[in-house]
Amino acid sequence: MIAPSVYNPTEERLLNRAKKYQADENINIYGFKHSGEYKGIVVFKTENKTAEILDIAVNPEYQGKGIGSRLIDYIFSQFAVNKITSETDDDAFGFYKKYGFTVIDTKLNRDIKRYVCECIKKVNNT
């Protein structure tokens, strides 16, 4: 499920990433399951009231149906964080922008433009 969010997702790279995630107690993995199938997944690390999205992926058949947004909503609602950060490329930038993330930096990685984004938790004052 996570392969679409990984650059050059070889079996070895995916296995190494899974081992890295299992070894870090600050990393959380949550999936969105519907009708017995996982439709989306988010991997994130929490530290000092901030969550960093390491991977987020939604089954292509279910993209555009709000699953990615619900995964981010879950992080804000279930963890004591007031900010979420993520690094992404052109493929997912529109998703983050639509959710409300803003670009705080850009960089090149393997000649691919990367966007460092953040989203501050919205406070309801009504």
Language-model segments: residues:
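Conserved active-site alpha-helix within GNAT-family acetyltransferase domains
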Residues: D90-K113
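Short loop/turn motifs at secondary-structure junctions and domain boundaries
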Residues: K20-N26
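Hydrophobic, well-ordered beta-alpha structural blocks that scaffold small-molecule cofactor pockets
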Residues: I41-V43, R70-Y74, K98
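Short amphipathic alpha-helix that is part of the acyltransferase structural core
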Residues: M1-N16, K33
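Conserved GNAT acetyl-CoA-binding A-motif
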Residues: S77-D91
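Conserved acetyl-CoA-binding loop-helix of GNAT-fold acetyltransferases
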Residues: V58, G64-S77
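Conserved beta-strand in the GNAT
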Residues: G31, E37-K45, T50-A57
